[in-house]
UniProtKB/Swiss-Prot annotation:
Family (UniProt): Belongs to the SIMIBI class G3E GTPase family. UreG subfamily.
Gene3D superfamilies hit by this protein: P-loop containing nucleotide triphosphate hydrolases
Name this protein carries in UniProt: Urease accessory protein UreG
Keyword Nucleus assigned: no
Chain's gene name: ureG
GO terms, molecular function: GTP binding; GTPase activity; nickel cation binding
A GO-annotated cellular component: cytoplasm
Length: 203
């Protein structure tokens, strides 16, 4: 059985996916071997951001230019991402975590099971407190849901209690967290969640 965990990170543009990868890499790299694949339609902006932040050594971060719909690149035709993941796994074997960040997409986004072992979906409070109840695979089926930027709730008139109630109803017992990734709130809990899903830690 493979000892690594492939983790998909998806969510709308600006929700905090790249910020999540930045904080997770900085938190986990002390104890684990990590690599990252990012997706952008026409650029490698997210990959370059992580490289410039020095969250990992440059070779461990690959930017994929999908040239089209972000959803297609992680679901229907994920060959570009699969090849990037395999390249990293061959180069840095053994790895513990391989993160695959989707380009910004809508609530219908989901990862191919051929590409990742589990998925994290990130939404943010600034989109309004109705987002959880709108559902979609990202809200209901992801292995972990993050509601980010909770510090903006008052500013945008979002009620966190409503978001909590709707999220618990839509998730039906699946895990989720409120986060403020700009100051690291929630990173410890997310890291523990991921560590518990490493194949070597499974009972």
């Amino acid at each position: 059985m493979s000892s690594k965990l492939r983790v998909g990170v998806a969510g709308p543009v600006g929700s905090g996916k790249t910020a999540l990868l930045e904080t997770l890499c900085l938190s986990l790299k002390k104890n684990y071997e990590i690599a990252v694949v990012t997706n952008d339609i026409y650029t490698k902006e997210d990959a370059n951001f992580l490289i410039n932040k020095k969250v990992l050594e440059e070779g461990r971060i690959i930017g994929v230019e999908t040239g089209g719909c972000p959803h297609t690149a992680i679901r229907e035709d994920c060959s570009l991402n699969k090849n990037a993941v395999l390249d990293l796994e061959n180069k840095y074997n053994p790895l513990d975590f391989v993160f695959v960040e989707s380009g910004g997409d809508n609530l219908a986004s989901s990862f191919s099971p051929e590409l990742v072992d589990l998925s994290i979906y990130v939404i943010d409070v600034s989109a309004g407190d109705k987002i959880p109840r709108k559902g979609g695979p990202g809200i209901t089926r992801s292995d972990l849901l993050l509601i980010n930027k909770i510090d903006l709730a008052d500013m945008v008139g979002a009620d966190l209690n409503i978001m909590k109630s709707d999220t618990e109803f839509m998730r039906k017992g699946k895990p989720w967290f409120f986060t403020n990734l700009s100051i690291g709130k929630g990173v410890k809990e997310i890291s523990q969640f991921l560590e518990s899903h490493l194949p070597n830690n499974q009972n």
